[in-house]
A protein has these predicted regions:
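SAM-dependent nucleic-acid methyltransferase catalytic core
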Residues: 155-160, 164-276, 281-284
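Conserved phosphoryl-transfer catalytic core
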Residues: 101-165, 299-316
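SAM-dependent methyltransferase catalytic-core segment centered on the flexible catalytic loop
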Residues: 263-264, 269-273, 279-346
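Class I S-adenosyl-L-methionine
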Residues: 369, 377-438
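Conserved proline-anchored active-site loop of SAM-dependent methyltransferases
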Residues: 58, 70-89, 93-100, 106, ...
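Conserved Class I SAM-dependent methyltransferase catalytic core
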Residues: 174, 312-382
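Alpha-helical packing segments of well-folded alpha/beta enzyme cores
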Residues: 54-57, 154, 158, 326-333, ...
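S-adenosyl-L-methionine
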Residues: 1-67
C-alpha cells in the first residue's frame, strides 16, 4: 500500500462517493450555499470533473449580472456547468476548453439531442454489436484490468465507432453518448456489491495511477462486474434527461483561452458575463486525473509518465506552472477578458488558494490580482472568500505530497476600467422551471423505452 494515501481508511473503493462536497460559507453570508447541494439541472450529473464549481454558483452570478438573451462566456468550461446553466436560464453562451474530456462534456450539455434521438442512436449501436462477431479487443493492460471481458468488448466496440472521426466532428448523439458513458466508465460499487458503473470499484471523480490501481486490485481481490453496457447507458441517460432543456444553443470551442478571446471568434465588447475557474496552480494534472476517460476518447497512455498521450496533453494543457509562468498565463487571460467584456459587463473568476508541503497557504487570488491586475485594463469591484472545510475537498487525498488546494476559494469580480456595470440583482431567485416532474418521470420514460425495444 502507498504510504501517502490510505485508501482503505478513506473507503474510496468500498463505498459510494458522497453526493456533494459543499457546505461552506462566504464572507458575505451563505449566498449560493443557502440552497441544497443537489440544486441544478439534471445534465450536470453527466460526469464528475475535478475542480468544478457547482451549478448554484454559476446560477448566482448569472442571475446577479445578466438578463435573458445576454451572452455568457466560460473560457475554461470544465464539465460545462456555466454554459449549461446559461442556456436553461435563457442566456446565450460561448464556452471553451482544450481538455478533450471537458470539450466533449460541454458540447454534449449545450446542444444535447432529443431523448428519442439519443436512445435510437444507442439502440442502433446495440443492434450492430449483436449482429457482428466480436473479437478480443486490442486494449492496453492498464485498461483491461479495470473491466470484465464482456463489459470491455462492448466498451471497445462503441469506442471504435466513435473514433472513426475527430472529436470536433462528432454529432450531438455521439457527444451525448461519449459524455454519458464517460460518467459511468468507473466508479464505486454499492454496499450490496451492485453498481451502475462499468469498472471495478474505484473513485468516480478521478483516476489514480495505473500502477497503484493494479496493486490495489490484487491486494483487495477486486472483481469487475459483468455489465450490460447498453442498459447501464440507458439508465444514465434517463437520469440526465430528467429535466427539460431549452434556450439558446451554446457555441463551444477547443482552443487556447487567451487566443480565443483575442480572435475574431468573439467580437470585442459583446460579452455580458465571464464566469470561469482558471486551472489551479500545481494542484492537479487534468490529464492524468482522467486517464481512463481520456483513453475512452481515444488518447492512449495518459496514465503513464512517459506515455505519448501524457506528453501531448501536458504540452497542450500547460498545467505545470511555476508561479511566474502562472502570472504570465493569468495576465494573458485577463487581457483577453478585457477585450470581450462589454462596458457594463462583469467577469467572475473562481481561484483557489494553494499550499506546498510544510508551507503557509498561498492566497493565490489576492496575490495574482495584486501582481497583474493594475495593467489588465480591469478593476476589482468585489472579492468574495468562500470557505470550504479541507476534509470536504477531493484534493485532500494527496495529503502532504504535492501542491494542493486549501479550504478557501476566492471569487474575483471584475469590470472594465472604463466601464460601469449595472448593480447586481438584490434578490437571486432559486426556482428551477426546467425541472420536468423529477425522478418518477425519468423512470416512466425509461420504462416506456424498454417496452418499445
Amino acid at each position: 500500500m502507498s504510504t501517502s494515501i490510505d485508501w482503505s481508511d478513506e473507503a474510496f473503493f468500498e463505498s459510494p462517493e458522497r453526493e456533494s462536497v459543499d457546505g461552506g460559507i462566504t464572507n458575505f453570508g451563505p449566498l449560493w450555499h443557502a440552497v441544497s447541494p443537489r440544486w441544478g439541472h439534471s445534465m450536470n450529473a453527466m460526469c464528475s470533473y475535478y475542480g468544478m464549481f457547482p451549478a448554484k454558483l454559476a446560477h448566482y452570478f448569472i442571475q446577479s449580472f445578466t438578463e435573458p438573451g445576454d451572452l455568457v462566456l466560460d473560457p475554461f468550461s470544465g464539465r460545462g456547468t456555466a454554459p449549461l446553466q446559461a442556456r436553461v436560464e435563457g442566456r446565450k453562451s460561448i464556452s471553451n476548453d482544450l481538455n478533450p474530456l471537458a470539450y466533449v462534456l460541454t458540447r454534449a450539455k449545450t446542444n444535447p439531442p432529443s431523448w428519442m434521438a439519443i436512445n435510437e442512436f444507442v439502440s442502433e449501436i446495440e443492434r450492430r454489436y449483436h449482429s457482428e462477431a466480436q473479437s478480443e479487443p486490442d486494449v492496453p493492460s492498464d485498461i483491461r484490468m479495470l473491466f470484465h471481458p464482456n463489459t470491455l468488448r462492448q466498451i471497445a466496440f462503441i469506442r471504435s465507432g466513435l473514433l472513426q472521426q475527430e472529436i470536433i466532428c462528432w454529432s450531438p448523439e455521439e457527444l451525448m453518448l461519449a459524455g454519458a458513458l464517460a460518467g459511468i466508465l468507473h466508479g464505486a460499487h454499492r454496499r450490496d456489491g451492485s453498481s451502475g458503473y462499468l469498472s471495478i470499484s474505484m473513485p468516480n471523480t478521478f483516476s489514480m495511477s495505473p500502477t497503484y490501481v493494479r496493486k490495489y486490485i490484487l491486494e483487495n481481490n477486486l472483481k469487475a462486474p459483468d455489465q450490460n453496457v447498453f442498459e447501464r447507458l440507458r439508465d444514465k441517460l434517463a437520469r440526465l434527461y430528467m429535466d427539460s432543456i431549452e434556450g439558446p444553443v451554446g457555441e463551444t470551442f477547443k482552443k487556447d483561452a487567451s487566443h480565443l478571446m483575442t480572435s475574431q471568434a468573439i467580437k470585442p465588447g459583446t460579452v455580458n458575463l465571464v464566469i470561469t475557474s482558471p486551472p489551479y496552480l500545481r494542484v492537479v494534472n487534468y490529464g492524468t486525473a482522467n486517464w481512463i476517460r481520456l483513453w475512452w476518447l481515444g488518447i492512449e497512455e495518459v496514465g503513464r509518465q512517459r506515455g505519448a498521450g501524457r506528453k501531448s496533453l501536458d504540452a497542450a494543457l500547460d498545467h505545470q506552472h511555476s508561479y511566474d509562468s502562472y502570472r504570465t498565463f493569468f495576465a494573458k487571460t485577463l487581457g483577453g477578458m478585457r477585450r470581450v467584456i462589454r462596458k457594463d459587463g462583469v467577469a467572475v473568476l473562481v481561484v483557489g488558494d494553494v499550499a506546498n508541503p510544510g508551507e503557509e497557504p498561498l492566497p493565490l487570488a489576492r496575490q495574482i490580482w495584486d501582481d497583474v491586475g493594475e495593467k489588465s485594463g480591469l478593476r476589482l469591484i468585489n472579492f468574495i472568500e468562500d470557505q470550504l472545510p479541507t476534509q470536504n475537498k477531493v484534493s485532500r487525498i494527496w495529503g502532504e505530497t504535492k501542491g494542493r488546494a486549501t479550504e478557501r476559494d476566492c471569487v474575483l469580480i471584475l469590470a472594465r476600467d472604463d466601464g460601469e456595470p449595472a448593480p447586481a440583482a438584490e434578490v437571486v431567485e432559486w426556482e428551477e422551471p426546467y425541472k420536468d416532474r423529477g425522478p418518477d418521470a425519468a423512470h416512466a420514460r425509461l420504462r416506456d423505452l424498454r417496452n418499445a425495444l
